[in-house]
Amino acid sequence: MCIRDRLNTPNSLAVCVDNSRQDIPPISGDFTFFGGIYRDVWLTAVSKQHFHLTNYGSEGIFISTPKVSEEKGTILIRGDIKNDATQKALLELEHIIYHPNGSIAQSLKQSIQIKAGEQYSFRSETSPILSPQLWTPETPHLYRVESILRDKKTKTVLDQSNHYTGFRWFSFDGERGFSLNGKPYKLRGICRHQDQKPIGVALTDEMHRRDIKLMKEMGANFIRISHYPQDDALLEMCDKLGMLAWEEIPIIDIVPDTPGYTENCERNLREMIRQHYNHPSIITWGYMNEILLVTQRLYKKEEELKPILERTLALANRLEVVLKEEDTTRVSTMAFHGSNSYNEVGLGSITDIVGWNLYQGWYGGNLTGFEQYLEEQHKKYPSHPMIVSEYGAGSDKRLHSLQPHAFDFSIEYQQKYLEHYLPVLEETSYICGGTHWNFIDFSSALRDESMPRINNKGLVYSNRTPKDIYYYYKAAWRQDIPVLHIASRDWTHRSGIQHGKEPVILPVKIYTNLPEVELFIDGKSLGKQKTKNFAVTFEVPFCQKEHFIAAKAENRKAVQDISFVEDGIRLNFTPIPANLNGSNLRDLELAINVGSYCFYTSDESNLTWLPDQPYTENGWGYIGGESKSSQIQIKNTNDGPLFQTLRNGIEGYRFDVPNGVYEIEFLFTDIFRENATTVYQLGRNSDVENRENRFDIIINDQTIEESFSSCRESDYFHALRKRYNITNFRNKIEIRFSVRNGKSFLNGIKLRKLY
């Protein structure tokens, strides 16, 4: 809009935004859609003759390197100049190319005449620059292109623009994978959402730059900018620090039959490409993510599904044409969820490369299903290059397990999952690479699970503190430096069952790229172990409230001499006696995560709830029942995971304890009601059935609750805690659940001796 009439007077500029329109992507997705204008806003003043700034939001200058080799390379500069004056203009356009060291490589100059109100397109290519310094993630050499527009007569500078470019070439091959500058190169990548608690997506430029620095520190060389174009500051750091990039527009889940949707998708694609065309880090443009996921789950009948598939195929073909019109120097891609239907309907053959979002061993199946699926795809489509565009498992630092399994959200299962996936990606030559989902624990408004509204598959927390698993990747990917990390920062408060005065043996894992590690507890050596898959696990004896754990490894990466690398951490430990009858229970608070194999440490109280166990004489445990779980959010508590697991059909619970007065606390949440599940759980639904549950609670033959109903006292999916003081004269506390309707259940139990 023209504001000349408003110059030299005070003005207010207001912008009203609305993201509710259904003809603008994204219309759905497994991430929170924050609103508002959250990127930088610039008010740009220009001369009457200037570079074209209204070309889909670009800067009006497009730079590429059409001819590149180790011996020589050329730079192509094209763009448009506008003359907004009422008379013709005689101009001079100069392009100066600077070497990475700042010296001038070449200068191009031309004279231009533009009629009043018209636009001029220019195109200039340098003569060959000999022995160019190639751009790679390890050596991100950048050449600067300075474009200067002057008045031909007065030499007055009318407009000026600076852009970086890099000399590199690349290829994707179905058998050989990815190559950069003529050499095989594994894409070691991360997907990145952009939010951060508590500011949503309104990150500062410094925050965007910090994220790329963290990825580079880990050893990543590739980023999938998912699922939407992100801040210029991010791509600037990709160029400068060396991070290959995949950028995409947010066409997700389903293609609606909405007027204008196709046109807006096309516009989104042109905007992304033109705005970010000059970044040498970008190697691929994407335009669809899991586009059949919602489609196939919502529409089962062929007459409903067929027109949607036809729309989807038509849009993909149209966008592929647009992409190649805009940029022939990069490749196209789409990301598919793990279903061969993409190939069956024809989507798999449209783009240059295919991305697969695979979660075998998390949402379903087992871990080895990952490599089996990839092998099947490669056998069927051997010429089609593949990237594993998503893989990951959730983790909650409050949850830990010595028997980790899928969807328990323990830190240990995420580690187990990724320790399986990464070697497959690294060792399979036809896989171009992978991008872990996700770099951060990000906001997802539709998710419940252990951390409601959060998808917790990140390698770092929302505040960007690295999880222990971050250092597994660092050990695997950073072969230029020694890495040694005791992987217990996410588990500093430990507990375990102690038999007599014997220490409790618990695993301590170390991530390292050094061949051998020695571990110490309170200064005493536990010996040395060889590294396997960048990890070493020691069985460590815990017996007191605090231990200092230290790891030491010989660093043979040093060129001049051999040195040692060390890491240390303090761990808190609470022993729980196996024989309660023979112990002093005065200071004991025995808390049990009923129905779960996980330790749970409350981040509010630091109290650790132990995994459940069957009753044994002189000890404690459940009698009867089976484990059940739900991923629905539990209200009225911040300790949701404690209430998402339970023992269903439990007959009783028993503690063999000395006589005295005890406080018993029961945790209940009735999860036995149908509730909505999100399609993004990829078919992993709760296994509970609808029913009303009522039962009596009996302690040492005394009925303390008749026809108890958790849902009547606190509603379904609401946390309920009930405490009772019991005088024990029997050297045992025996709890029985007598069913009146449905089944009995228990989510948690806590015992504390008062007197």
List the predicted regions and their residue ranges.
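Secreted/periplasmic carbohydrate-active enzymes, especially glycoside hydrolases
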Residues: 4-225, 237, 242-245, 268, ...
